[in-house]
Amino acid sequence: MQPSNPNQFTEKAWAAIARTPDLAKQAQHQNLESEHLMKSLLEQEGLATQIFQKAGCSVQRIRDLTDEFISRQPKISHPSGVYLGQSLDKLLDRAEEARKQFGDEFISIEHLVLAFAQDDRFGKKLFQDIGLSEKVLREAIQQIRGSQKVTDQNPEGKYAALEKYGRDLTLLARQGKLDPVIGRDDEIRRVIQILSRRTKNNPVLIGEPGVGKTAIAEGLAQRIVARDVPDSLRDRQLIALDMGALIAGAKYRGEFEERLKAVLKEVTDSNGQIILFIDEIHTVVGAGATQGAMDAGNLLKPMLARGELRCIGATTLDEYRKYIEKDAALERRFQQVYVDQPSVEDTISILRGLKERYEIHHGVKISDTALVAAATLSARYISDRFLPDKAIDLVDEAAAKLKMEITSKPEELDEIDRKILQLEMERLSLQKETSAASRDRLEKLERELADLKEEQSRLNAQWQAEKEVIDRLQSIKEEIEKVNIEIQQAERNYDLNRAAELKYGKLTELHKKLAEAEAKLREIQVGGRSLLRDEVTEADIAEIISKWTGIPVSKLVESEAQKLLHLEEELHKRVVGQDEAVSAVAEAIQRSRAGLADPNRPIASFIFLGPTGVGKTELAKALAAFMFDTEEALVRIDMSEYMEKHAVSRLIGAPPGYVGYDEGGQLTEAIRRRPYAVVLFDEIEKAHPDVFNVFLQILDDGRVTDSQGRTVDFKNTIIIMTSNIGSQYILDVAGDDSRYSEMYNRVMEAMRAHFRPEFLNRVDEFIIFHSLRKDQLRQIVQLQVQRLQQRLSDRHITLSLTEKAIDFLAEVGYDPVYGARPLKRAIQKQLETPIAKAILRGDFFDGDTILVDVGEDERLSFRRQVELATV
């Protein structure tokens, strides 16, 4: 049996009462008594446990005492039913009286808890045992309820709403859990100024993502705690509203609005003591709106206008425009505070302020040069994000990487471990051998193993010692930080004795320990070769930038410097002749990697001019293969596809309102994903002249704005354009160097006739490719044969051509007008097809060497090398 009329109770209170018969049955009791209700309330983990915690009681102790009392009651083995006991009946009557005292409409959990104070059967004794008086209980209930009344059947969601749906930033600042905020004084001062107004005292922080809007609110919280604010803001609480928690779990219509109203009521009832901070304030507009329902923004409006609610908002420029500007009534209630991206110098100061926090967290040191590098390199190479966020991320990731290296086994030790494993496997197999040579080898191996194991244990001991000291340093630094926070708290509370005791006692001792640990680490590192690095340097930051963007930022390693010095030779392995073109491209790369290129323009921009088939596109491919080890790093755009005026939208993206607007452009998307690339615009004369207007910004400033309004950075690209314009003039003077300048002028005239001067004027160099000579064609034959050889290597077939065969192919494939392409066709016809047929006939097998020569009939002959050897 249960008490009647659930409509008198709130949902949670009725759920607790409805659970009591089950608990009584489990305990084999026939009567429902007050102890069963207490057990039910404690099982809920809801308001009852909150009240006891607020009153300073141990919930677990109350649970244990309740269970103990229940277990002592007489049991009935098979109770036919359960009946309402006297104690519970009286308790419910007292709860009804408590409801009337509080002026509520329903009996709630707190009324039931309060009724236990007068319960003669169980409650009084329980509260005596745990030392809880009715007065303390009432105070705890009052603190949780605040000024809320029970006006519906689900009031618990509205109690201590700010505690549930907000983070107290001032409390976090007192505990030292917020990162220090450096600079931003003007913005914080403006926020304080707006908050001090009589009406419309609501600043909204607007700025790009990552510039530090939330940090300004945290900075204000720190100032409030440090009492570095005007009297109007002294001892105020700054609470960040968690919109996610507010919306989460609001199942019924109107539940979200009720929660928000409860939060706003607490704020207004505090008479200006509480300042609300809503991060991502645009989420408030439209939040909780269903058909015909008010959204959260409309609930805020009246209070914002009257000055009852002091609220700081933060949102990005785009979202402010999209959501808040559309709602003019909401917009006028907020005063805008623009937060700009800090300069590189300011970012360095911010990083210096945060340095200690990151050092303590990761347990590594961060050098000042690393901080400067993080600010300068991120500003230069990461264009789609904002300072200081991107610089802080760099430092954080570099420190995390170093910490990971410290905790994992050093490379030297790892190599020795592998070597020992290898030798032990060899020893096992040698032990089974009986020959004298095997025994000698075994003896030698045993000696080698003993030496290696000795070295292994020495390195292991050193690694553990270094790691131990580094960990100790981290724990001492953490201790120092805790003591510093305690000192600040003592000074704020004017407990100067405690502050002095900590400052001149504990802190001095910790600094002494820190100095000792640092000296010990230096001793280990200087005495023996150091296995671990414990400091983040400029090189670490450069490495992280390279991982993020693919741009080689790190200082040149000697091997890479040598590789760059021989860049021309590398390119000539693929591109025959064309010395001017190859050296111009090589010099541009050398300038860039040595750090002498103009940082505000592309690395280099070229127009390759010349007849077809002389190596213009091949040079671009060779360059991409050299720089990125793959030809696929070449962003190739065939300009013959851009013959119409409107085709430019394919490069930078379709304008708003057109199909494909969200997809971005072929060129801009490729460079956003891979900012360090070789961009090849093939056959530029085929494109519509208006398409080249896009190139003006790319070539001059190294950037272009796509259809979405994003700036795409071309400063780390090499731009190569190829064209056949004027190729007839180049062919006319083939092999005649004396007429070169005349030919160059005529080609440039043809270019000027076709392209606009403002486009041509922005290109770094015009490089003319000459038509190929016969001796160069022989080299190309050898290159093409090498490629064919690679394809045959899968079948282990080797290809060998005599000098006569090479001359024959060069002669057949020579055509000055078409360059090297006819040669490719000749090799296909004269060499590849006959070999393919011979393999299919079974003339050649895997592992054969095919000798290619010119037969008496002036055609290529094919035979096995082995046959030749036996003749």
Swiss-Prot record:
Annotated stretches, region: Repeat 1: 9-73
UniProt-annotated stretches for the region NBD2: 560-771
Binding-site positions, ATP 1: G207, E208, P209, G210, V211, G212, K213, T214
Keywords attached to this entry: ATP-binding, Chaperone, Coiled coil, Cytoplasm, Nucleotide-binding, Repeat, Stress response
An MF annotation (GO) of this entry: ATP hydrolysis activity
Pfam families, per the entry: AAA, AAA_2, AAA_lid_9, Clp_N, ClpB_D2-small
Linker: annotated span: 342-550
Compartment(s) where it occurs, according to its Swiss-Prot or TrEMBL record: Cytoplasm
PROSITE patterns: CLP_R, CLPAB_1, CLPAB_2
Region (NBD1): 160-341
Tree of life domain: Bacteria
Similarity comment text for this entry: Belongs to the ClpA/ClpB family.
UniProt note: domains: The Clp repeat (R) domain probably functions as a substrate-discriminating domain, recruiting aggregated proteins to the ClpB hexamer and/or stabilizing bound proteins. The NBD2 domain is responsible for oligomerization, whereas the NBD1 domain stabilizes the hexamer probably in an ATP-dependent manner. The movement of the coiled-coil domain is essential for ClpB ability to rescue proteins from an aggregated state, probably by pulling apart large aggregated proteins, which are bound between the coiled-coils motifs of adjacent ClpB subunits in the functional hexamer.
Name the record gives this protein: Chaperone protein ClpB 1
